A protein has these predicted regions:
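Short active-site segment of divalent metal-dependent hydrolases/proteases
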Residues: 118, 122-126
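An acidic/histidine-cluster motif and surrounding catalytic segment
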Residues: 1-113, 125-170
Length: 170
């Protein structure tokens, strides 16, 4: 997997985990999903203002959020040649927002960032949570991956990936 990490235009946003760990987590998601094709992923570490602008542009919501995923191609796209790499897309994460959110879920900022990174990568692979059935499937996959990676907590689980049409957790 090829990973590009960008700090966005305002370089004050800093991820609470290392670039090596980000790469390792994304590779764990690909392995869990059985993806063997070479994939390109861009991860942007953004400020609240930067992610608010992206949220407005892509989702029509004028508020900061934790993670936005912008998918490009899927690994099983029949238009890709056998040896052709897949441009999965972009994951935009807002560490300051994620840190505030961590307190609501009684997790550390680093663990919440890990959760959002897995969540964003699964969106690039086609998972969604627009209804309860999709959300349950996505949560089960997230929990399986989180159980396999190192975290600050002895066990880390995901709940509440359901959102209404305004993007608010329900």
């Amino acid at each position: 997997m090829t990973l590009v990490i960008d700090r966005g235009e305002d370089e004050t946003a800093v991820a609470p985990i290392s670039q090596e760990e980000i790469q390792s987590i994304l590779e764990a998601v690909l392995a869990d999903e059985g993806v063997e094709r070479t994939c390109y992923v861009s991860v942007t570490i953004a400020t609240d203002d930067e992610i608010r602008a992206q949220n407005l542009e892509w989702r029509g919501i004028n508020a900061p959020t934790d993670v936005i995923s912008l998918e490009c191609e899927y690994p099983d796209d029949p238009d890709l040649g056998d040896d052709e790499p897949c441009e999965l897309g972009d994951i935009i994460l807002a560490p300051a927002f994620i840190e505030r959110q961590a307190a609501d879920f009684s997790t550390t900022a680093a663990d919440e960032f890990r959760i959002m990174l897995v969540h964003g990568m699964l969106h690039l692979l086609g998972y969604d949570h627009l209804d309860d059935e999709e959300a349950q499937v996505m949560e089960e996959v997230e929990n399986g991956i989180l159980a396999a990676i190192a975290t600050d907590a002895p066990s880390l689980t995901v709940e509440f990936t359901r959102h209404d049409e305004d993007g608010d957790a329900v």
